[in-house]
């Protein structure tokens, strides 16, 4: 139960921070381009790289700290960072074909799922 609570706390903090970054970007840059989403995705990818190296490799941190920072905080801040780490991990293990398939499938299927969800709701509503 404590592990789920750590994920929830980290997720809440990450989500609130994502909201503030989005609002800041909207005020600074305007609504013409999703700058806030781009910013959290890029920053989240950088931070997951830092956390993955420090927390799992350099300091051998506890499962609880990993859940709080990586699963919780970055999961709330951006899920794109987890996707990127998974893809890089495949490439680092020498599984370039699997990495390419994972990237193409993730982006392609996710886009298709959004289009399908939009189409279904537009047809029903």
From Swiss-Prot:
<keyword id="KW-0479">Metal-binding</keyword>
<keyword id="KW-0406">Ion transport</keyword>
<keyword id="KW-0915">Sodium</keyword>
<dbReference type="GO" id="GO:0062054">
    <property type="term" value="F:fluoride channel activity"/>
</dbReference>
<feature type="transmembrane region" description="Helical">
    <location>
        <begin position="101"/>
        <end position="121"/>
    </location>
</feature>
<dbReference type="GO" id="GO:0140114">
    <property type="term" value="P:cellular detoxification of fluoride"/>
</dbReference>
<feature type="binding site">
    <location>
        <position position="75"/>
    </location>
    <ligand>
        <name>Na(+)</name>
    </ligand>
</feature>
<keyword id="KW-0813">Transport</keyword>
<dbReference type="GO" id="GO:0005886">
    <property type="term" value="C:plasma membrane"/>
</dbReference>
<protein>
    <recommendedName>
        <fullName>Fluoride-specific ion channel FluC</fullName>
    </recommendedName>
</protein>
<keyword id="KW-0997">Cell inner membrane</keyword>
<keyword id="KW-1133">Transmembrane helix</keyword>
<dbReference type="Pfam" id="PF02537">
    <property type="entry name" value="CRCB"/>
</dbReference>
<comment type="similarity">
    <text>Belongs to the fluoride channel Fluc/FEX (TC 1.A.43) family.</text>
</comment>
<keyword id="KW-0407">Ion channel</keyword>
<dbReference type="InterPro" id="IPR003691">
    <property type="entry name" value="FluC"/>
</dbReference>
<keyword id="KW-0472">Membrane</keyword>
<comment type="function">
    <text>Fluoride-specific ion channel. Important for reducing fluoride concentration in the cell, thus reducing its toxicity.</text>
</comment>
<keyword id="KW-0812">Transmembrane</keyword>
<feature type="transmembrane region" description="Helical">
    <location>
        <begin position="32"/>
        <end position="52"/>
    </location>
</feature>
<feature type="transmembrane region" description="Helical">
    <location>
        <begin position="68"/>
        <end position="88"/>
    </location>
</feature>
<feature type="binding site">
    <location>
        <position position="78"/>
    </location>
    <ligand>
        <name>Na(+)</name>
    </ligand>
</feature>
<dbReference type="GO" id="GO:0046872">
    <property type="term" value="F:metal ion binding"/>
</dbReference>
<keyword id="KW-1003">Cell membrane</keyword>
<feature type="transmembrane region" description="Helical">
    <location>
        <begin position="1"/>
        <end position="21"/>
    </location>
</feature>
């Amino acid at each position: 139960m404590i592990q789920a609570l750590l994920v929830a706390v980290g997720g809440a903090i990450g989500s609130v921070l994502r909201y503030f970054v989005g609002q800041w970007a909207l005020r600074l840059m305007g609504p013409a381009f999703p700058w806030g989403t781009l910013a959290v995705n890029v920053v989240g990818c950088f931070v997951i790289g830092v956390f993955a190296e420090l927390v799992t490799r350099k300091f051998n941190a506890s499962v609880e700290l990993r859940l709080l920072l990586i699963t919780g905080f970055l999961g709330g801040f951006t899920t794109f960072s987890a996707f990127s780490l998974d893809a890089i991990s495949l490439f680092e293990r020498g599984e370039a074909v699997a990495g390419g398939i994972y990237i193409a499938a993730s982006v392609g299927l996710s886009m298709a799922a959004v289009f399908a969800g939009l189409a279904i709701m537009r047809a029903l509503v």
